[in-house]
Amino acid sequence: MKTPPSPPAPSKTLLRWQRAPLQNHLHALMPQWGGQALDISSQDLASNASFVNYVRHHRFTDPNTGKPVEVVEKSIRKIAFIGSQEARFHRAEGMLAGSTQFRYPACLGVIETPWESLIFTEFVRGKPPRMQAIARQLALGIAELEDLGQAWLQAQPLGKAPLLWSMDFFRPWFLLRPRFNFARCLPGLAQLGRDDTQFAGLAERFEAFVPLMRKLAGEARRSPRCFSHMDYLRKNLFVNKGQLHLIDWSEVKVGRVGFDGGAYLGSLFRRKDMGVFLAAQSEFVEAYREALAERFDEGQALGNLRYVFLLTALFHCLRPETVEEYRERERMGMLREKYEYLLGACL
């Protein structure tokens, strides 16, 4: 991992009326270079996030020290001149200060134009972890992140209330997304039951989750707020010298305590066999309960964890693409096992 040897400009959010060459942006963020020429090599990185124009890895040499510098630039297009959640999060200076469990790439700055947000962060190298093997590490990091986020939100002036309100998980523009509406998949499950007798009658049983999820959402809405990363996938985590690095805040929300644990376990449930999932779930929940800050109610946090776990697991296990994937791999028995777990352990 290479980091810029000198601090960026005092304010890491810069406003521009139009896009400028990359070198101009870097000089604006790092004024100590005094406009000296930079020999930059760039490489596009993979990205499938909504509204992302591109993600690029830039390499160049610090003209003052001669040391190598590696920076990631992410361009996120705006809709109706409204910036992205991720750009707003990176403008929340100091929120991650004091973190000891996770490591985060330093944000060098955010450049806002009317049409896009450009986010510049340090480049992180490391080995992607086996997600079930880091359950305890994640539990400690998530508990710390929730504590830091809640403290930061409580310290904000009233003038930031509209911005934070717009980032809240319970705004309609988030809740209407397909991934948070598993009930849309029930007609497909009913058809699956007609085609395959081992799935007969399951759609009617899964309908019981509709009122349950409404109840859990109401309880979660009233619980303590914090920042929630919401995207604990292998591609967003790296291990470097024993430290766990968390990147990519494209799904960040003003969430609730417990949400990130549910997001992690929901993703694990979607991808792993039941034995692997159950072992990791037990390890995660035990460590999370121990690490949870005293300011939070344990029962409330675990209830919120259950809510987001179900949101994630129900949609990803019921959607037609998942059913087809299991059919092609001849693993419909495993899918049926996951359905039984959801119906038996979660209702």
Name these PLM-found stretches.
Residues 63-164:
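ATP-binding pocket architecture of kinase catalytic cores
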